[in-house]
Amino acid sequence: EGVEATHAERARRLRIDDLVCVFDGIGRSAAARISEVTQRPLQVHLVIDHYEHWPPPATRIHLVSALPKGDRQATMLDMATQLGMTDYTPLRCDRSVSQARVQTYDRWRRVLIESCKQSHRPWLPVLHPSVDLKDWIAQCAGTNAVNVIADKGGGTGDQAIENCLLNAESVCLLVGPEGGFSDTEREHLDEAKSEMLALGDGVLRVETAAVALIAFVGRLLSSDGSPP
């Protein structure tokens, strides 16, 4: 019912006996047939044929990034989800140009759902509250997560990152604002156990860096036999 029923009946023009695939966002999907469509309120009734349960990703890919402006936020989350992002945390930085608001999360969740549909990913990414860089580093100190930071001063090779990813249960990908991290923030980063990775010679937009970083790490995980 609700938004999904409207999309099915009016946008996709699905009718009785049409076949659909539905998912719950926590690993379960189902093949179903439309058995009835009622109006006021609009509801689409389904008959489930069979269920499938998909295990969670072997390695969680957690994007922690400064927010780009406006519609670029949705673009970033859309592409990141298609590439295998499992978690997202907005990062508050000294040079951030945008901040997450309560109503923003509702819009982001809709983007994530549509992206999972597009890419046939049965696990919906988890949205976390925004956090300061210093607090994030403190949170990571007690975990076994691998931290990879997009930075022009980092390395460019695969081997160092690939070695860190061996048997990793979670990898956190940090992307700062387009103005870069402040000197104070860089001091905090120096204290953290992390790998710096250069994504090119130019200054990338936040969403470009985030997507490039996820694609890079996802490829390494896949080549190691661990699907992103």
Predicted segment positions?
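Active-site/ligand-binding-proximal alpha/beta "capping" segment
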Residues: 147-186, 194-198
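Glycine/charged-rich beta-loop-alpha catalytic/anionic-binding loops adjacent to active sites
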Residues: 2, 58-62, 170-172, 191-199
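Structured adenosyl-cofactor binding patch, chiefly the S-adenosyl-L-methionine
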Residues: 183-228
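N-terminal positively charged helical leader segments and presequences
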Residues: 1-53
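RNA substrate-binding interface of SAM-dependent RNA methyltransferases
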Residues: 51-149
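Hydrophobic side chains in well-ordered alpha-helices
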Residues: 8, 73-76, 185
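Fold-independent oxyanion-binding glycine-rich loops
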Residues: 2-3, 25, 67, 130, ...
